[in-house]
A protein has these predicted regions:
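Short beta->alpha junction loops
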Residues: 91-102
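Single conserved hydrophobic/aromatic residue that forms the stacking wall/gate
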Residues: 1-8
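Flexible loop/hinge segments that line or gate small-molecule binding clefts
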Residues: 11-35, 144-152
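Hydrophobic alpha-helical segments within soluble ligand-binding/sensing domains
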Residues: 33-55, 158-178
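An alpha-beta-alpha
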Residues: 41-92, 182-202
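Extracellular/periplasmic periplasmic-binding protein-like sensory domains
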Residues: 134-204
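Periplasmic-binding protein-like
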Residues: 5, 20, 114-125, 140-142
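Segments of small-molecule ligand-sensing domains
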Residues: 176-263
């Protein structure tokens, strides 16, 4: 459908097409849009780090390190955790599927059996949250406010606000300012964020999140800043610089030093 849409858009100059999470565009009336979800992942890592007692945090991941979107999210989460709890470890269990309820259940159970007391996720079902609640520990949801699924466990959820892009895109067509460029918004555009924190978060969590959010919004914190050590002992990045967008979206195939993949 994606390829056909791009092909069919070419001769229809008065209709505008936008594809979420895509990569193809014609620079005219077919564009793609995505967002800096890693910014919200970083904030959620702060929440997780502030609330762990075992210093073991789990992460159910849809894809392995070959997928930069998933891996970048894990690393951003880990960097957020590290900023408040450098001794904590993040254990990742990969399902190799964007949607597999059974695999997501099994992955969450593996992490809970390892005494992870906060379980985050980049997968579609709410099972990591509901299973965390059943065990009496915490979770970090994704895509929607999962506190409705696990009100006693979900510390917060990482969410998208796609309406921010849709409003801007439609307005640009109305105004005649549509320029055919791709879109990559973030917290400054209100495209990504985290939900309100649970009232059972430990003292100081909100303050830590607020400070980090201010730094991200101001540009002081780019999340992937400076020299970053991977879990294989190598380093990426340069002192005084932030990884560029091309690297963030397509070149993060490594894990931060506090991350361990569970086989």
């Amino acid at each position: 459908i994606y390829t056909l849409s791009l092909h069919d858009a070419l001769p229809i100059s008065d209709i505008y097409f936008a594809h979420g999470t895509g990569y193809k565009s014609n620079g005219k009336n077919f564009v793609n849009y995505f967002g800096r979800i890693y910014q919200a992942r970083y904030l959620s890592g702060i929440v997780a780090g502030m609330n762990t007692k075992t210093n073991k945090l789990g992460y159910v991941a849809a894809m392995d390190s070959s997928n930069s979107e998933v891996t970048g999210g894990i690393d951003a989460f880990a960097l957020g955790v590290y900023s408040v709890k450098p001794e904590a470890k993040i254990y990742v269990k990969v399902t190799n599927s964007w949607f597999d309820p059974d695999a997501e259940k099994a992955a969450a159970q593996t992490l809970l059996n390892m005494d992870c007391d906060v379980v985050a996720q980049h997968c579609d079902t709410e099972y990591p949250q509901t299973m965390a609640q059943e065990k009496g520990v915490y979770g970090i949801g994704y895509n929607s406010d999962m506190s409705k699924n696990a009100p006693d466990a979900c510390l917060c959820s990482v969410i998208w606000n796609w309406g921010a892009y849709y409003t801007a895109a439609v307005q640009s067509v109305i105004d005649g300012t549509w320029d055919g460029s791709n879109y990559y918004g973030g917290m400054n555009e209100n495209l990504v964020g985290i939900t309100s924190l649970a009232d059972f978060c430990t003292d100081g969590t909100q303050e830590a999140v607020d400070t980090a959010k201010e730094d991200i919004l101001s540009g002081k914190n780019g999340v992937f800043d400076g020299v970053i050590e991977t879990n294989t002992g190598e380093t990426v990045g340069e002192e005084g610089k932030t990884l560029d967008d091309a690297t963030i979206t397509g070149g993060i195939n490594w894990y931060f030093k506090t991350v361990e993949v569970v086989e």
